[in-house]
């Protein structure tokens, strides 16, 4: 590598080539996070419920976490979303329109003992799921 007084441009060019060996730079420069993301970089997305599924919790816990399988409206991708709250799955039926957001696990991954689930249901038919679980609002009839 040149080290002279006029070597700045050559050093900069070399560094720009070298950056492509850094996986973090590659993912950022090529926009791979947004491409791989089912929500397409958005904080929330709407989807249609395909089915209700029970996901077994990881060891040492023993439970069946109530989740729903959803097809996103914007791109047709299918994701699994967790239904937070006691009895929340009762407010969700097949073919309902739900709003999902990321579940908040580290590095965009799943959270806690729910394997492979990266999203959670926030609203059903444009009514907050939290409000329905607490009893403050009722689910609208479509």
Swiss-Prot record:
Single Gene Ontology BP annotation: translation
Q: Which InterPro entries match?
A: NA-bd_OB-fold, Ribosomal_uS12, Ribosomal_uS12_arc, Ribosomal_uS12_euk/arc
List, alphabetically, the CDD domains matched: Ribosomal_S23
- Pfam families tied to this protein: Ribosom_S12_S23 (PF00164)
Keywords, in A-Z order:
Ribonucleoprotein, Ribosomal protein, RNA-binding, rRNA-binding
| PROSITE patterns, sorted | RIBOSOMAL_S12
Statement: the UniProt record of this protein carries the keyword rRNA-binding: yes
Molecular function GO terms recorded: rRNA binding; structural constituent of ribosome
One GO term of the cellular component aspect? small ribosomal subunit
Q: Write out the transmembrane intervals.
A: none
Query: Among its keywords, does the record have rRNA-binding?
Result: yes
Quaternary structure and interacting proteins, as annotated: Part of the 30S ribosomal subunit.
Q: What does this protein do?
A: With S4 and S5 plays an important role in translational accuracy. Located at the interface of the 30S and 50S subunits.
Q: Which family does it belong to?
A: Belongs to the universal ribosomal protein uS12 family.
**Family matches, as HAMAP family:** Ribosomal_uS12_A
**How is this protein named in the record?**
Small ribosomal subunit protein uS12
Organism name: Methanothrix thermoacetophila (strain DSM 6194 / JCM 14653 / NBRC 101360 / PT) (Methanosaeta thermophila)
